[in-house]
UniProtKB/Swiss-Prot annotation:
It comes from the Eukaryota. This is Cysteine-tryptophan domain-containing zinc finger protein 7. Transcriptional activator that acts as a positive regulator of grain size. Binds directly to the DNA core sequence 5'-CATTTC-3' found in the promoter of MADS1, and activates MADS1 transcription. Increases grain width via direct up-regulation of MADS1 expression. Promotes active chromatin modification at the MADS1 locus by increasing its level of histone H3K4me3. In GST pull-down assay, binds specifically to histone H3K4me3, but not to H3K4me1 or H3K4me2. May facilitate the recruitment of effectors to mediate gene expression. The keyword Signal does not apply.
Length: 1600
């Protein structure tokens, strides 16, 4: 029989053993290192015992007898092989007869597919065969007894191997040095011992050198030269022939099958081979019964392995020799038997068992054959091996491609000839190892893989892929084995695998960093590394395996997977790793794919392995498919409907220079075309989202929504994808590549390196689904996308991506975005493509698959909480944020924490202060964006993620590019509103608690009126003038920004505004259209400027103007009420409709105006109620749009809740009251408080932080100026006390009023604070009305309780302006009282003095010359207009009293006031004129901006209807048609306002000239007096203060 003996035994004089050798071996299995089997076998004479067999064998298998080399013997093969080798195929597959060195030859053979089947044995077999077996082996007649015994021994050996593998380090050392000499002796156990030389010669095994391999200097033992020339008929070859080839006339009876070889090949990953080398040697030795020798060899081998490792990867042969033992079919069989694992008849069967689909098996077989051929070639020449390595690389690539569709690990092994070869050995070893200790081998293999990957990492992904493929194959084998093998083995393997994985990852990372030529590494790794490195790795892995408790980082991922549902951990992660094209890391993971993971990868949790085994969701092919995106379509058990090849979308982001938020550019937009300085207002592709207030998530989601439909219809909601992309979050539940893609995209994809995704994205990003900061997910993004998914199956991939993202420095704080996939760090680069093709593809496919799987596995994955909980929604960002990204482009975003988190924090009082500090204040939305897009870095709570995702989906559904603000608001707000509303509520509550009306974050000085003061003022005064406004008096944003924002606001309100309130629009009592949009505007106000939002086109300004105007002035021209707020009004560029003042396009100005409205007097009750009671009606030149300030405030607060809470809650309808000459003062009821809320909540006011915010308290919030002498009824907050009762007192100077005086809402929400008796007086006065041209100015009774309270942020000293305003109001109130008492002359003088004071205040509100005054002159414009009306009233009174000189001065003041107002309206008027020219060309219903005009028309129609319905007595009612037309054409309205101011100024000039002429003719005041008057009339309007000084001098000269 054949027996394997060590030279040591020979030295010891151990004789040839007969059948008793089996028993000896049996004993050997239990022997410790250094111990030898009993020598009784030496006395067995095979010639005598088996003499009759020799002839038979010679006759039947003569040419094969020489194949019984190395560790392979009849004994080893056992009875199943027939004991005699009689079942071997008639034709032999001879490995190349010559190898460079015996070790090399051994290695080559082990690499050969032949050896792969008996992976474990082949390694040892090589070692043994090399030294002892010659080409011409004598006939071998193994005894059946011996073989059976041998099998027993092998099983025991296997057991020992498992135990010994724990101590592989020592064993490997001994195995390295202890080489087996294969001796074939024929004879019975009892037969006389034959001379060794005779036996060898008879068998053709003439080997002169008795020295053992272990004696070789290299520690691997040198093979005899004969061995080098050993033909392909090595034991390994024989085993392969037995298993793989049929005997002529029929198939082999051998139990071994082709699949066995393939199986071993599967198991063979180099790491396994390496591990196997050490383990296999031990096992082989056990098999042969030379435990002692094996031990020795192992001890030496360990050293040798290290030496080899250090020496050269080329010394594969030596290592392979060691490996041969196990690789031999006998060894493999033994291993299987020891494990009680039925030999796999077919890899497919195995796969079926594993649950994995081994469609690759046929391919494997072919590959295996090819492998065999290649192996032979390698055997012939190591050089050829190197060449083959190259071939293998190509093949590996092919295998990967094939495997992607569904080829099994076999294909991989086939692809990599060497790898397969090694894999075969490794597989055999794995089997042995499984027998002995799969974990050890697995860990070893892992280590080998690590080592290979390390060397190969530098090289190329192909190496990794090849290794991966091998690994995958190996996992398949290991998996099947693992199933059979005890869980402990799996656990050990897993642990080892984890260790090896972590090491491999580290090594791979290092290698990646140090990447060298891929081809070299491939060759070296496959060839040289396979044996030496493998051994080393085995040793390492064994040592590691011996410390399974030590789990590598990689393990953590697997651990996560372990916790994940079984099906989930596999393909996805691998796919992510592999598919991601993360060459090095993925190869490891790939190799560890389900099968490997299951059996080979200790890193993989048992559960994971078992799940793969049980669920078999991912076959290696499946994993490969996952790895290979193109092949994703390959049918896999897990595969959801085949995903279309991921569409690689180059995602570009642009960063706003103002808000630093990232905006996803349309996929085909070239970022290079963008201007250097880019602002959110330039975001024209999303009509309603071109505001800084809009969060990144919103814009990303909206944009992605446009591209969602293209997403594969896998049943995955496009919204979900885009949302996921936006958030950068992926559902870990789905194992599909889509999930990977999704994750990858998460970030915030947003990943700077292009690995978006996550979000974040990466995101996934991750934030949640877009959590912008997910986000990041997203995108996060987020980077992770920094989100690690709780779900284990995704955890690996996710971790991998996260690592990548992190390594790639995904900046998603959120995720990707920021919280955004695009973090602040990304700010430096405005435009960047966040996602790479690979990531996009993988993300997309993974995302889709995940969705599909989620749907399919609703039972398992349906739990959205699970997905979210698992962190599948990475981005977060990723959403996206990674940033939120659509399947194609959105990311991150991934991984992104829910926007609400940021928003919440922003809403904090500290945030308020921050806003005040920061010139630019971002609304919670913006913050939310950051949060959402933090896709990346920040993980929102899962619940928050879920919510965000849902919201995002909703927003997506609604996010169709909003045509109008309303629609947008409804859409985006639906998603964000919840979080934002909550945030706003919290903020609001905080603000209310703090009683801070609002903090305007103004780049300029901000004076916040305390709500207490405001309330006191309100309580004390109805008069608007007395209450300070909280307004941003600072410069408004540049007009370009404003205009762009305004245009955008039309659609913009959607996301940010909606977030705060969707219902608000409905809530406002004022015209629903305008109100809703107003809310949007207010929301914008909170974010940008509420006014703009009202109408996308400039007309929207009119609404804001109303607010601001009302706030600023009692329409009557008692501008004082809001004069404190004038600056804030100034910010409101919008012109009051009355005054035809347009709000400046800039949102800031609009915001400022609204804050002003909100800033109107707020009583404590207001604070308590949080009710801004606003009577809003601006009669600008008779055009009055009344809009409830409450609505504005509500909008500003950004909440429906912000609607007035108390009885005041009844919103004053936008009553456009036109008191004939009576301008109702807008009562800004606790607007200020509301505004404060707005500011804190939204940046509506703050957003215009650039402008200094003046907090003016409108005590009564309204001042009444009789337009053209008409007293305005003032509405007290608690009451709508004053209606323009003096309609009879329509201005006789109606002509002076081109349009009705500013409208005031007659209706004012009741204010809890009692009105002062003055209010009643005022009411009485109003009732009386002035008969004269200037009816009494409706004077709000409230006296300013405290000048300090009324301080307003004026560019000049706030206090001085406040005092001046207070004095003007006091004078006006006093004049009203005197007029009621019938003292007309005194009252007229006081009115005039009051008008002069108002002019002074208006002049102080003018922006400095250095500043673009046209942007900030709303307050001044409004005050000038109202003052002009008051002056006109005074002039009319003087004319009646025949004081023509005084009348001339009054009219001069009217002229100056109107000219000043027109002066500041001119820039807008000029544009409007141009627009009107175009409009004239267009059909009446159309305007240059259709969307804006639509909204404006809607709002304007409602507004125009409001005035007519509310004040039927108003002269404007008659002008309704005109008003409607004007409203429909905001440009026309503004132009008319401008024209009206100019006309009024010229009319006043004419009147003054007539008056002075009349005075001169009458010579009533003497020459000096007339001269002074003449001087005044000749004075220009530029220097108001100088003019006022001259007027006072003239008044004294004329004794008036």
């Amino acid at each position: 029989m054949l027996s394997v003996r060590r030279r040591q035994e020979d030295a010891r004089g151990v004789g040839l053993r007969g059948g008793a050798a089996a028993g000896g071996m049996e004993d050997d299995a239990e022997l410790e290192e250094g111990e030898a089997c009993g020598d009784e076998t030496a006395f067995v004479d095979p010639d005598v015992a088996l003499s009759y067999i020799d002839e038979k064998i010679q006759d039947v298998l003569g040419h094969f007898q020489k194949d019984f080399e190395g560790a392979v013997s009849a004994e080893n093969l056992g009875s199943k092989f027939g004991g005699y080798g009689s079942f071997l195929p008639t034709y032999q597959r001879s490995p190349l007869p010559q190898t460079r060195s015996p070790p090399k030859a051994a290695n080559v053979s082990s690499r050969s597919p032949y050896h792969q089947p008996t992976e474990s044995m082949s390694q040892n077999t090589l070692a043994v065969a090399a030294p002892s077996v010659s080409k011409h082996n004598g006939s071998m007649v193994p005894l059946s007894d011996d073989s059976s015994k041998k099998e027993v021994h092998q099983s025991t050996k296997v057991e020992r191997a498992s135990s010994t593998q724990d101590s592989l380090n020592g064993l490997s050392k001994s195995s390295d040095h202890n080489r087996f000499k294969v001796r074939i002796k024929v004879g019975s156990d009892n037969g006389l011992a034959r001379n060794n030389a005779a036996i060898y010669s008879g068998l053709g095994l003439d080997i002169s050198s008795p020295s053992s391999i272990e004696d070789s200097p290299d520690g691997c033992g040198s093979l005899s030269p004969e061995f080098n020339n050993v033909p392909i008929e090595s034991p390994r070859t024989i085993l392969q022939i037995m298993t793989c080839f049929s005997v002529p006339g029929g198939f082999l009876l051998s139990p071994l099958r082709d699949d066995l070889v393939q199986l071993t090949q599967k198991v063979v990953p180099t790491s396994k081979k390496w591990e196997t080398n050490a383990n296999t040697e031990n096992v082989q030795e056990r098999y042969e019964g030379y435990a002692a020798k094996r031990v020795k060899s192992d001890a030496k081998k360990k050293k040798a392995v290290d030496t080899k490792r250090s020496k050269s990867r080329n010394d594969v042969s030596a290592v392979m020799k060691n490996e041969i033992d196990i690789e031999t079919p006998a060894g493999q069989k033994i291993v299987l038997e020891a494990l009680n694992i039925p030999l796999l008849s077919n890899p497919r069967t195995m796969e079926a068992k594993d649950g994995s689909q081994f469609e690759e098996d046929p391919m494997r077989d072919t590959l295996v054959e090819n492998k065999d051929a290649r192996l032979k070639e390698r055997t012939i020449n190591s050089d050829l091996m190197a060449i083959k390595y190259e071939n293998v690389k190509a093949e590996a690539a092919e295998c990967l491609e094939n495997s992607g569709p569904g080829s099994s690990g076999m294909d991989f092994s086939a692809v990599k000839g060497e790898v397969k070869f090694k894999a075969e050995k490794a597989e055999i070893h794995v089997e042995d190892r499984n027998t002995t200790s799969e974990k050890d081998f697995q860990s070893d293999r892992k280590q080998e893989r690590k080592i290979k990957t390390e060397s190969k990492c530098n090289a190329t992904g192909v190496n990794f892929e090849g290794n991966k493929v091998m690994n995958e194959r190996t996992p398949v084998v290991g998996r099947s084995i693992g199933k059979v093998s005890s869980k402990e083995t799996l656990l050990n393997d897993i642990n080892e695998e984890n260790v090896s994985k972590s090491e491999s990852r580290r090594s791979q990372k290092e290698q990646n960093m140090n990447a060298s030529s891929s081809s070299d590494f491939l060759e070296d790794d496959r060839g040289v590394l396979s044996s030496g490195a493998v051994k080393e790795r085995k040793n390492d892995s064994q040592s590691k395996s011996s410390h399974p408790g030590r789990k590598p980082k990689a393990k953590s991922h697997r651990d996560v997977r372990e916790h994940l549902p079984e099906g989930s951990y596999g393909g996805k992660d691998d796919t992510l790793e592999n598919g991601s094209g993360l060459g090095e890391l993925r190869p490891k993971k790939i190799w560890k794919n389900d099968s490997e993971r299951d059996s080979d990868m200790p890193g993989t949790s048992k559960r994971e392995i078992s799940s793969s085994l049980k669920n078999d969701r991912h076959t290696p092919a499946e994993e490969q498919r996952m790895h290979v995106p193109p092949s994703v379509s390959a049918p896999t058990a897990n595969a959801a409907p085949m995903l279309p090849a991921p569409v690689v979308i180059e995602e570009h982001w642009v960063c706003c220079d103002i808000c630093q938020k990232w905006r996803l550019l349309p996929y085909k937009m070239n970022p290079s075309l963008l201007p250097k300085k880019w602002k959110c207002s330039m975001l024209q592709w999303l009509p309603g989202m071109n505001r800084c207030e809009v969060s990144e998530d919103e814009t990303t989601n909206a944009l992605n929504a446009l591209y969602v439909s293209p997403a594969p219809g896998n049943g995955v909601a496009s919204v979900g994808h885009s949302h996921v992309a936006s958030s950068g979050l992926t559902t870990s539940n789905t194992l599909n590549v889509n999930g990977h893609v999704e994750q990858s995209r998460k970030r915030k994809n947003t990943l700077s390196d292009g690995n978006v995704s996550f979000d974040v994205s990466q995101q996934m990003q991750g934030s949640v689904y877009p959590l912008s900061n997910q986000h990041a997910p997203i995108r996060s993004k987020s980077a992770a996308d920094s989100i690690q998914f709780p779900v284990e199956r995704d955890s690996k991939s996710v971790d991998h991506f996260v690592e990548k993202k992190r390594s790639k420095s995904k900046n998603h704080g959120s995720s990707s975005d920021g919280g955004h996939l695009v973090e602040r760090s990304k700010k430096h680069s405005k435009v960047k493509s966040k996602r790479e093709m690979d990531h996009d593809e993988y993300r997309t496919s993974k995302k889709i698959k995940k969705e599909e799987r989620r749907q399919r596995q609703s039972g398992i994955d349906s739990n959205p909480g699970y997905d979210l909980a698992s962190g599948d929604v990475p981005d977060e960002a990723k959403a996206l944020p990674s940033k939120s990204m659509a399947l194609q482009g959105s990311s991150e975003r991934s991984d992104v924490p829910p926007s609400k988190y940021k928003s919440v924090s922003k809403y904090n009082s500290s945030e308020k202060s921050k806003r005040s500090k920061d010139g630019d204040v971002f609304l919670p939305e913006d913050k939310n964006k950051e949060h959402s897009y933090p896709s990346d870095a920040q993980k929102p709570d899962l619940s928050s993620k879920k919510r965000i995702v849902k919201e995002w989906e909703e927003s997506q559904h609604n996010s169709t590019p909003p045509v109008s603000k309303m629609s947008i608001v409804n859409q985006s707000s639906s998603s964000k509103e919840t979080c934002k509303d909550q945030n706003l509520k919290e903020t609001k509550s905080k603000l209310t608690k703090s009683e801070e009306p609002f903090a305007m974050t103004d780049s300029k000085s901000i004076k916040v009126a305390h709500s207490n003061q405001t309330s006191r003022n309100l309580n004390n005064e109805l008069f608007e003038d007395s209450t300070p406004f909280a307004v941003k008096s600072g410069m408004s944003e540049p007009p370009e920004n404003r205009s762009s924002e305004q245009a955008l606001d039309l659609a913009e309100p959607a996301s940010s505004d909606l977030a705060y309130f969707q219902t608000t629009a409905v809530t406002s009592s004022s015209s629903k259209a305008s109100g809703s949009q107003r809310r949007k505007q207010n929301f914008h106000v909170a974010k940008t400027s509420p006014i703009e939002s009202v109408s996308s086109s400039p007309p929207r300004i009119s609404n804001n103007d109303k607010v601001s105007h009302d706030k600023i002035l009692g329409k009557d021209g008692s501008t004082c009420a809001n004069t404190n707020n004038m600056q804030s009004l100034v910010k409101n560029t919008e012109v009051i409709v009355d005054n035809v003042r347009q709000a400046r396009k800039s949102h800031e100005s609009m915001l400022a105006s609204e804050p002003v409205m909100n800033g109107f007097s707020q009583g404590n009750s207001d604070k308590d109620n949080e009710l801004p009671q606003l009577t809003q009606g601006h009669a600008s030149n008779g055009i009055i749009s009344g809009r409830s300030l409450d609505d504005d405030l509500q909008h500003a607060s950004g909440r429906k809740d912000s609607s007035l809470k108390s009885s005041n809650a009844a919103r004053s309808h936008n009553h456009l009251h036109y008191a004939n000459k009576n301008n109702l003062l807008t009562d800004g009821s606790s607007i200020q408080h509301r505004m404060a809320v707005l500011d804190t909540k939204g940046d509506s006011m703050v957003h215009e932080n650039k402008r200094s915010v003046t907090s003016l308290q409108d005590r009564n919030g309204s001042t009444h100026y009789p337009p053209d002498g008409n007293p305005q009824s003032e509405v007290s907050f608690g009451k709508e006390k004053s209606h323009p009762k003096s309609n009879k007192h329509d201005m006789q100077n109606s002509k002076a009023q081109m349009l009705p005086s500013p409208l005031k809402e007659s209706k004012v929400e009741s204010h809890s604070a009692p009105l002062r008796s003055n209010a009643s007086k005022l009411t009485a006065q109003l009732k009386r009305g002035n008969v004269e041209n200037g009816g009494q100015h409706g004077i709000t009774k409230q006296a300013i309780s405290n000048p300090a309270d009324t301080s307003s942020p004026v560019r000049k000293d706030n206090n001085s302006t406040g005092y001046a305003l207070k004095e003007a109001r006091d004078l006006k109130h006093k004049a009203n009282r005197l007029k009621e008492e019938g003292k007309e002359q005194e009252s007229t003088r006081l009115y005039f003095e009051s008008a002069l004071k108002y002019l002074h205040v208006a002049s102080t509100l003018e922006p400095p010359p250095s500043i673009d005054g046209f942007k900030q002159c709303d307050a001044a414009q409004n005050l000038y207009s109202d003052t002009a009306k008051l002056c006109n009233f005074v002039g009319h009174a003087y004319e009646k009293s025949k004081k023509m000189a005084a009348a001339a001065l009054a009219y001069k003041c009217v002229e100056v006031a109107y000219l000043k107002a027109a002066y500041y309206k001119y820039p807008t008027a000029s544009k409007d004129r141009q627009m009107l020219q175009a409009i004239v060309q267009n059909p009446p219903g159309e305007s240059p901006s259709s969307s804006a005009s639509d909204i404006d028309n809607l709002n304007n129609n409602g507004l125009s209807k409001g005035p007519s319905s509310k004040d039927a007595n108003s002269p404007q009612v008659t002008g309704n048609n005109l008003l409607l037309a004007a409203r429909n054409q905001p440009h026309l309205t503004r132009l008319l306002a401008y024209t009206n101011d100019v006309n009024c100024a010229f009319d006043a000039t004419r009147k003054s000239q007539m008056a002075i002429a009349s005075a001169a003719s009458n010579q009533e005041n003497g020459i000096d007096g007339l001269s002074s008057v003449k001087t005044v009339l000749d004075f220009n309007f530029q220097s108001v203060n100088d003019l006022l000084r001259l007027v006072r001098l003239s008044m004294e000269s004329i004794s008036c």
